[in-house]
Curated annotation (Swiss-Prot):
Family named by the database record: Belongs to the CWC16 family.
GO cellular component, one term: post-mRNA release spliceosomal complex
Species for this entry: Rattus norvegicus
Name of the protein: Probable splicing factor YJU2B
Signal peptide from the UniProt entry: none
Location(s), subcellular: Nucleus
Keywords of the record: Coiled coil, Nucleus, Phosphoprotein
């Protein structure tokens, strides 16, 4: 492309190299085009880069280091034989113009107008940096022997202070000097780590296939290993320890039972029996009779009453005496009828035994609340009968 650019220039028919010399003179233009529009005033348009952070005086905005501007470059003086240049540029955030110039004596840039520097400088002596030797000091070192001796002593003391730091830097550089050995060590460590990761992945895959798991497994940690070691599925005591404990317990056990044991067991048994007897006992006289609850026994269905029983019942009824009888006559009458009453009682017992249904007794008749008594609830109205 370079040679093609030089060969592909258009030369008009009236171009005369002896008269015009170059195409720029033929077109009456400068090679830098618009950048050289103020070249007659000694000003050249260049691309200037901000050397440090500043604050614009017009808009009070921060302009960072490295921001580029189209600046007017102009020579304003010399430092010995080094020229001093000034740069004038417009702020990209406002209409303010900023002027800066070089400082060859301090190897720095100085703000002339339009901005203020963000102070981030430090002293080179405090930072233990190498300072540039001034021209007057160089001449004095060359001509004055005493000054050169004093300067040498100061340099040696500075070297003693900086020697540990320099040796540490040198050791660090020597450690990383052999690139091949470092690369081999790094690759070997990488291969070992990769192999361990592959083995761990194979174990995880085998466990997932065995337990039919579809979730990713988290890598183990030291806390997990300690917890798993505490949760093993075996007892704390071995078989021999258990047998030894059993033998010791048997040896120290008393041969005779304690006095409180049988009494307590018998008392418990008696309390249980008492509760059962209470549950089987019939209710007391305060409880209502079956007739009061509307429960009657149906005698006609269970067994027909014999005529002998009816006759005995009629005989057992006490005859009413005439109204003129006395108590003495009643006693005489009772003594005479004593054998008759005994006969009537026996006949009543026989009748009751005949009238009772199968599986029932006389106690069931006297206590109808027992489960053996066959009771039927009669809900019919007494008046209707």
């Amino acid at each position: 492309m370079g040679e093609r650019k030089g060969q592909n220039k258009y030369y008009p028919p009236d171009f005369n190299p002896e008269k015009h010399g170059s195409l720029n003179r033929y077109h009456n233009s400068h090679p830098l085009r618009e950048r050289a529009r103020k070249l007659s005033q000694g000003i050249l348009i260049i691309r200037f880069e901000m050397p440090y952070n500043i604050w614009c005086d017009g808009c009070k905005n921060h302009i960072g280091m490295g921001v580029r501007y189209n600046a007017e470059k102009k020579k304003v003086g010399n430092y010995y034989t080094t020229p001093i240049y000034r740069f004038r540029m417009k702020c990209h955030l406002c209409v303010n113009y900023i002027e800066m110039q070089t400082d060859p004596a301090n190897c720095d840039y100085v703000i002339v107008s339009g901005a203020s520097r963000k102070e981030e400088r430090w002293d080179m002596e405090d930072n233990e940096q190498v300072l540039t030797t001034e021209h007057e000091k160089k001449e004095k070192l060359e001509t004055d022997a005493m000054f050169r001796l004093e300067h040498g002593e100061a340099d040696r003391s500075t070297l003693k202070k900086a020697l540990p730091t320099l040796s540490h830097i040198q050791e660090a550089q020597n450690a990383w000097k052999d690139d091949f050995a470092l690369n081999s060590m790094l690759r070997r460590h990488f291969r070992e780590k990769k192999k361990a990761m592959q083995e761990e992945e194979e174990k995880d895959q085998a466990l997932q296939a065995k337990a039919n798991l579809a979730i990713p497994l988290v890598p183990e940690s030291e806390d997990d290993r300690r917890l798993a070691a505490l949760l093993r599925l075996h007892t704390l005591d071995s078989y021999e320890d258990k047998q030894r404990m059993k033998r010791t317990e048997i040896i120290h056990r008393s041969w005779f039972p304690s006095a409180q044991g049988p009494s307590t067991s018998s008392s418990k048994a008696s309390t249980v029996l008492k509760k059962l007897c209470r549950g089987r006992r019939p209710p007391t006289g305060s409880a209502g009779a079956p007739g009061d609850l509307g429960i009657v026994r149906r005698k006609s269905r269970e067994a027909p009453e014999s005529p002998q029983c009816t006759a005995d019942n009629s005989l057992s009824e006490e005859p009413r005496g005439p109204p003129g009888t006395t108590p003495d006559s009643k006693t005489l009458q009772g003594t005479a009828e004593a054998p008759r009453t005994s006969k009537t009682l026996e006949s009543k017992r026989n009748c009751s035994d005949q009238a009772l249904p199968l599986g029932s007794s006389q106690e069931d008749l006297l206590h109808p609340n027992t489960p053996n008594a066959s009771l039927v609830a009669d809900y019919s109205d007494s008046e209707s009968e």
